[in-house]
Amino acid sequence: MSSLGGGSQDAGGSSSSSTNGSGGSGSSGPKAGAADKSAVVAAAAPASVADDTPPPERRNKSGIISEPLNKSLRRSRPLSHYSSFGSSGGSGGGSMMGGESADKATAAAAAASLLANGHDLAAAMAVDKSNPTSKHKSGAVASLLSKAERATELAAEGQLTLQQFAQSTEMLKRVVQEHLPLMSEAGAGLPDMEAVAGAEALNGQSDFPYLGAFPINPGLFIMTPAGVFLAESALHMAGLAEYPMQGELASAISSGKKKRKRCGMCAPCRRRINCEQCSSCRNRKTGHQICKFRKCEELKKKPSAALEKVMLPTGAAFRWFQ
């Protein structure tokens, strides 16, 4: 009995030991799987940490940091980084990370090509930026040249205008010098008037500064084939009403004309309204006659009688020379 009990106990112990051994082996199996998973996680953790770390700064020969133009390419890494990472990986995760490293290698190659294209684009943009500057400079030079040409044209036009004005002034001076001696033949005593006028012109200022060399107003002279005569307005400017012989003077000056003018000083000349009663007013449309009450008294006289009585004042009548 004892032997049988001991045998059973031995069998139970062996069974228990076998079960324990199997349990131990079973328990050791999950522990080994957990260790493998932890190794894979530990191997993958540096990759995630490496992904989170910023890429190293790349500098060119001048020391300038060369960054890609696109913001999405700032996390790109050189191909050596991915190749070294793939070679340093564990044997267990090598097959798992092989495809991922290949994808990253292709992405790095694409990033490098994009970076090269970006540098080419930057160079092209720099050339384009330099070209508009040169175009702008050439346009500014062309505009300055056009402005200079326009200024020279305006100066030439101004000189031509001044030359024409000088020529016209010289011609007018010559005409006045040619016709002034004829005035002395119009009546007695006119040479004295010329002498007085010349003296006053030398000593006094001209009333017409725009004429320059002319001390008299050319509009006061009427140039006709018969000669040069003073206009009627000249006698009004001279103020001949102060002298008693103004009628005779007006008749003497205007005697060289074929048709005499009104003196403008007598009462009929100063009258401005027609009577509308006389025959001249009634027949004005057919006869073209002036009103009898407005007919100048000096025109009623004969020209010869007026010439005999001419007495000229001592230059005071020609006040426009002063």
Curated annotation (Swiss-Prot):
Q: Which GO terms describe its molecular function?
A: DNA-binding transcription factor binding; methyl-CpG binding; sequence-specific DNA binding; zinc ion binding
> What switches on its expression?
By retinoic acid.
Q: Where is the composition biased (Low complexity)?
A: 11-20, 28-52
Provide one Gene Ontology cellular component: cytosol
| Gene name of the record | CXXC5
Subcellular compartments: Nucleus; Cytoplasm
Q: Per the database entry, which stretches of residues form a coiled coil? A: none
Q: Its biological function?
A: May indirectly participate in activation of the NF-kappa-B and MAPK pathways. Acts as a mediator of BMP4-mediated modulation of canonical Wnt signaling activity in neural stem cells. Required for DNA damage-induced ATM phosphorylation, p53 activation and cell cycle arrest. Involved in myelopoiesis. Transcription factor. Binds to the oxygen responsive element of COX4I2 and represses its transcription under hypoxia conditions (4% oxygen), as well as normoxia conditions (20% oxygen). May repress COX4I2 transactivation induced by CHCHD2 and RBPJ.
Question: Which comment does the entry carry about domains?
Answer: The CXXC zinc finger mediates binding to CpG-DNA.
Q: Which residues bind Zn(2+) 1?
A: C263, C266, C269, C296
Where do the record's region annotations for Disordered lie?
1-100
Q: How does it assemble?
A: Interacts with DVL1. Interacts with RBPJ.
Extent of motif Nuclear localization signal: 257-262
| Positions with biased composition (Gly residues) | 1-10, 87-97
Instruction: Name the positions where Zn(2+) 2 binds.
Output: C275, C278, C281, C291
In its UniProt record, which GO terms are filed under biological process?
negative regulation of transcription by RNA polymerase II; positive regulation of canonical NF-kappaB signal transduction; regulation of generation of precursor metabolites and energy
ZnF (CXXC-type) ranges: 256-297
Record keywords, A-Z: Cytoplasm, DNA-binding, Metal-binding, Nucleus, Phosphoprotein, Repressor, Transcription, Zinc, Zinc-finger
InterPro entries reported in the protein's UniProt record: CXXC4/CXXC5, Znf_CXXC
Protein name in the entry: CXXC-type zinc finger protein 5
Taxon lineage: Eukaryota, Metazoa, Chordata, Craniata, Vertebrata
Residue numbers of Phosphothreonine PTMs = T53
